[in-house]
Amino acid sequence: MKILVIGSGGREHALAWKLSASPKVQQVYVAPGNGGTALSPNLKNVPITDLAALRDWALAEKIALTVVGPEQPLAAGVVDDFRAHGLRIFGPTQAAAQLESSKAFSKDFMKRHGIPTAAYETFSDPGAAHAYVDRLGAPIVVKADGLAAGKGVVVAATKEEAHAAIDDMLGGNTLGVAHNDGGARVVIEEFLQGEEASFIVLCDGKNVVAMASSQDHKRLKDGDEGPNTGGMGAYSPAPVVTPDVHARAMRDVILPTIRGMDKDGIPFTGFLYAGLMIDGDGKPKTLEFNTRMGDPETQPIMMRLKSDLVDVLMAATSGKLDEVELQWDRRVALGVVLAAGGYPLSPKKGDLISGLPKPTDEVVVFHAGTVAAGDQIKTSGGRVLCVTALADSVRQAQTKAYDAARTIHFDGMQYRRDIGHRAVKASH
């Protein structure tokens, strides 16, 4: 069978890599893909970004299954369109994707269905937003209501920072985020204390299967300093997600979400990613929902998945996830993102990448912001590569990933040296 993966990041490279390992697959296409997918012998890039043109191509090629990586095509309704033309596609409809594409929809949904989350208010009037911050004080969280590539969130340590973020998002709207009703809007919410975890599940509208737990590193610099990014590294499993926390997350967050969406007439199919904050008592609260796999969490999760992903997604697109039990490698996988100089604000592009190691069973370099120029690979964006390693312990996986990362070079390359530091600490 032929499979299409939509997207161009490290997450899509990892999904395509995993799908291409299935004996049922004749060819995996990635649209538009990147330098890594271009040069992989098992994958083929399709240089189409227009979704209607891609649908026509998929019909002509008789694509048996399409998997959507990023949020933008989901918010644009790619799933609705492919389905309307009889194509099998895994992902949420445009209406269901609002759990991610609209912060206000998401928070109102959680309030309505009793899903634990931070207290919040939504504002489009700067004056009222400033007054709310003055009343609540800091630390406080200010979020642009709409898709902002994971960067539309300011955790303000002081009231001044919060006021500046409001001016930025509502006054200047420098992120250029328009929410679904047009105009700028912010969600301001209480700051939650605890440890974060990425809890990702597969849904078929009614049934849910949990993926392995993982933990992302959002900040640019070591010790969780610097600006927020799309994610600088991740590992799986996350020790903070104990069996007890796992049970609570399913009971208090995931199942009420899937049931609530169904009840609201918007059944959810696809990957659902709950960003959780787990407090000292092991109680999870929902920071945000993403309606797709995380990036870079997908890379270590795919390294650990032993089940045939094609079988799993065919079941998920037939409403048969209740028949699926996922098999996982018991080892730890850890991925380190190598980012371009100037990331996240103004990443450099066009630099030659050298020293890429050949993939092995235990170390794979997934590509994101890369482009193939002949048989050379150049940088083309913010997060360039994700070096992912599998080993018996988090410390060994860390060593293996960093050893591989040190062989790679491109001008201005930057990466964190402490990915997995919480898990290493927890293992002592």
Question: What is the role of each PLM region?
Answer:
Residues 50, 371-374, 378-428:
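Generic C-terminus detector
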Residues 1-94:
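ATP-binding N-terminal substructure of ATP-dependent carboxylate-amine bond-forming enzymes
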Residues 249-272, 290-362, 373:
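Active-site "cap" helix and flanking loop/linker of ATP-utilizing ligase/carboxylase catalytic domains
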Residues 169-173, 192-241, 250-297, 344:
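Phosphate-binding core of ATP-grasp and ATP-grasp-like enzymes
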Residues 92-152:
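A conserved helix-loop-beta module that forms one wall/lid of the active-site cleft
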Residues 44-50, 121-125, 156:
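Short acidic-hydrophobic, aromatic-tinged amphipathic segments that line or gate anion-handling sites
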Residues 116-118, 139-142, 156-198, 256-264:
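Conserved ATP-binding module of the ATP-grasp superfamily
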